[in-house]
Amino acid sequence: MILSIITGTGHYLPNKIIKRDHFMKHKFYDNRGFKIKKSNEEIINKFQKITEIEERRYVNEGLLNSDIAAIAAKKALNNSKICKEKIDYIISAHNYGDIHPISYQSDFVPSISAKIKNKLRIKNKKCRPYDMIFGCTGWIEGMILANQLLRSKHAKNILITSSETLSQVTDPHDRNTMIFSDGAGAAVLSAMEYLENEKYGIIHYDTQCDNNEKLYYLTNGPSLNPNYKKSLVNIRMNGRRIYEYALTEVPTMLKNMLDHANLHIHDIQKIILHQANAKMDYAILKKLLELYNYTSLLKKDCLLKIMPMTIQKFGNSSVATVPTLLDLILKGKMPPHEIKPGDTILMASLGAGMNINGMIYRFPNKKK
C-alpha cells in the first residue's frame, strides 16, 4: 500500500526583526478614512494584548517571495536526502507572487513554482511547477493535492512550498498591518510502500470553502488613508467576522475529521494551528476540547502543552506558519515540544475565501 510520507522539511525566517517601536510613528486610520484619535501607545498595547505578537520578521530589501521560497525548498530537499532531479511536482502555496520593488504590484508570470524550480537549478523537464492560491490555507491544501497525486501513482516525490512577503502588501495606516510578517516553509512528500495494517503519513484530511457571504472577509483594497497612493494592493481584513467564523466553523470541522478517521482528541500528540492570532487560536482549541467535554484542560498552560505557538516572535506569515512551526519542532528548536516516531499530529489552517482545512499526520515508527 502506498502512503504519503514527509521525508524532509525546511523553513526560512528573515533576519530583520520588527518590534513595536517600528509602529510608534505610524498614522492609523479607521475603515471610514478618519485618523484614529487614540495614541499609538494605546493602539499597540491593545493589539499586543489580543494577538500576543511582540515582534515579526520582514525580508531585507531586494529579497523576493520566490527567493525565500527557494531557500526553504533547498533546506527541505537537503533534509530529505532526495535528489532534486527526482522531484515530480513543485506545488507553491502563496497569494501575492513576487512584489515588484517599484510598482508594488504582484507578479505572477512566470509562476512562483517555476521560479523556484529555476532557482533550484532543476533540469528535469518532467518536474511540473504548480501554484496554489488558496489563502493562508494554501500549504495544507498543497499537501492534500500532493497526497492525491502520490496515492494515485502519478508522482513519487513532491516538493510543497509556502512563502509570503506580506510586509510589501500591508497598509501602514491600517492597525492590522502589525499582524503580518514574512517567511517561507517547505516539505518533501514521498510515496512509500507499507503493509495494509500500517497507517502512517497523511491518514485523513478535510477542506471546507465558504465562498459566498464570507468571500470578502479577507481581501485587498486601497489604503485607509485616502492620501496614501504608494500601493493599490493592500490586505484588507474584517477581523471580527473572521474571528466569529473561525470559532463557529473550525472546531466542528476538526472534530468531524477526527471522527471520520476513527480517532479521539486524546490520540493526538500535537496540534499545529495556523498562527493567525493568539486569542483566536486559544479559542479554537478550547472549543474543540469542549466538544470532547475536556473542560479541565482549558487553562492556557494546558493548551500550550499540546499547541505550540510562534506568533509571539514571528507574527503571521500566512501560508508559511504551519510548515515553519512543524520544521522548528522536528529540528528540536521548540523545546519542550517534540515529535517522536509514531506520534500523530493535527494541522489546521483558515484563510481568505473563506477556506478552512485540516490534516491528520502520523509519523512512521522508523525510517524506510
Which residues does each predicted region cover?
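Short beta-strand segments
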Residues: 93, 133, 158-164, 189, ...
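Condensing-enzyme catalytic core mediating Claisen C-C bond formation in acyl metabolism
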Residues: 1-62, 173-248, 252, 350, ...
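Acyl-CoA/ACP chain-elongation machinery
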Residues: 162-163, 210-218, 277-280, 312, ...
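Claisen-condensing/thiolase-fold acyl-transfer catalytic domains that form or cleave C-C bonds
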Residues: 66-70, 97-106, 110, 131-151, ...
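Acidic-glycine-rich active-site phosphate/pyrophosphate-binding loop
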Residues: 40-46, 107-123, 160-165, 224, ...
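Flexible, glycine-rich active-site loops centered on histidine and acidic residues
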Residues: 154-184
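Buried hydrophobic positions in well-ordered alpha/beta secondary-structure cores of metabolic enzymes
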Residues: 6-8, 47, 76, 90, ...
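Conserved beta-ketoacyl condensing-enzyme motif
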Residues: 6, 62-133, 263-283
